[in-house]
């Protein structure tokens, strides 16, 4: 299944570029690269692996994330990316992912922060109730459009997942390769 998702990442990054005749080369993200960047997470929950310009003023990024055990009652801590769409591919573990619903007490990330300029684009965080809850586990794929609040209400142990980020405003740095894997 991971090979299929990596193939989808290659197709997403290659097809628009070929259609626009901007490039005839695909961008690969190998399992070895994912593992190498994952090993550097440390206290962070999110690291970018690569960002590629796919044409039509759009970048696509691939990041690796891991979150530890979590249990909430009522309000869920959430994030909203104003323009960036995310596609999660769950590698290990699982939990309850909640999407939608109104975001309350929103705090915007500083526009010059690494979170905005390297990882997720312009975004805010806050809490929300309601929305749609779904159980996710290894092998599942979830698409979260830009502007949709999302967060986990429960993670029994941990969850490790890839985030494929479609950045229509090219805020994320095209050509970025995580220094751990840069050749």
Regions found by a protein language model. Give the residues of each.
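A short hydrophobic beta-strand segment most commonly corresponding to one strand
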Residues: 157-175
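Conserved metal-binding segment of the jelly-roll/cupin
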Residues: 134-156
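Short, conserved beta-strand element in jelly-roll/cupin
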Residues: 82-97, 101, 109-124
């Amino acid at each position: 299944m991971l090979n299929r998702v990596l193939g989808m990442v290659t197709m997403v990054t290659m097809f628009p570029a070929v259609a626009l005749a901007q490039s005839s080369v695909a961008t690969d993200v190998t399992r070895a690269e994912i593992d190498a960047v994952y090993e550097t997470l440390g206290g962070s929950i999110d690291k970018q692996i690569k960002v590629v310009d796919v044409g039509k003023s759009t970048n696509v990024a691939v990041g690796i994330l891991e979150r530890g055990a979590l249990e909430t009652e009522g309000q869920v801590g959430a994030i909203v990316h104003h323009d960036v769409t995310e596609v999660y591919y769950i590698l290990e573990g699982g939990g309850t992912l909640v999407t939608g619903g109104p975001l309350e007490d929103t705090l915007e990330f500083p526009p010059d922060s690494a979170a905005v300029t390297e990882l997720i684009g312009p975004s805010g965080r806050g809490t929300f109730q309601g929305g749609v809850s779904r159980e996710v586990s290894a092998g599942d794929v979830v698409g979260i459009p830009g502007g949709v609040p999302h967060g986990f209400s429960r993670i029994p142990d941990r969850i490790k997942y890839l985030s494929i980020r479609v950045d229509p405003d090219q805020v994320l740095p095209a050509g970025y390769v995580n220094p751990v894997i840069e050749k």
